[in-house]
A protein has these predicted regions:
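Short helix-boundary/capping micro-motifs
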Residues: 12-28
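Alpha-helical DNA-recognition elements
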Residues: 27, 38, 77
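Alpha-helical linker/hinge and terminal dimerization helices associated
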Residues: 42-43, 64-86
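N-terminal winged-helix
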Residues: 29-30, 34, 80-81, 87-102
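A short LG(V/I)-centered, amphipathic sequence patch enriched
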Residues: 40-57, 62
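Residue cluster at the C-terminal edge of the helix-turn-helix DNA-binding motif
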Residues: 15, 24, 37-46
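The N-cap/first-turn positions of alpha helices
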Residues: 2-8, 29, 61, 68
Length: 102
């Protein structure tokens, strides 16, 4: 399980539709399905039930959603903070006196 899979899972929870979630993530439906299937295999059970082309979360899926949402949010905040620090960093300039250069 990695942060990317958790992000994909949360987007699918928001959309409750593979096609819309894949489009939002700029992925193919197949790639999204593979990622969710790998997550389900790692967690030893389904995260979603599909009936009449409608997705619903299983109990396991609801539990993962509760735990994954703050983790992904904190990760995204960390990325934004680090990116801001990198953007605000100033180059270091070193000057050498002529007498020291000789």
């Amino acid at each position: 399980m990695d942060i990317r899979q958790l992000h994909y899972f949360l987007v699918l929870c928001d959309e409750m539709n593979y096609s819309r979630a894949a489009q939002r993530l700029f992925l193919s439906r197949q790639a999204l399905r593979q990622s969710i299937s790998a997550l389900e295999a790692e967690l030893c059970g389904p995260l979603f039930l599909s009936a009449h082309h409608k997705l619903t979360l299983t109990d396991r899926g609801m539990s993962l959603q509760r735990h994954a949402a703050p983790v992904v949010e904190q990760f995204q905040q960390m990325q934004a903070a680090l990116h801001a620090e990198i953007q605000s960093a100033q180059p270091v300039r070193i000057g050498i006196s002529v007498s020291l250069a000789v």
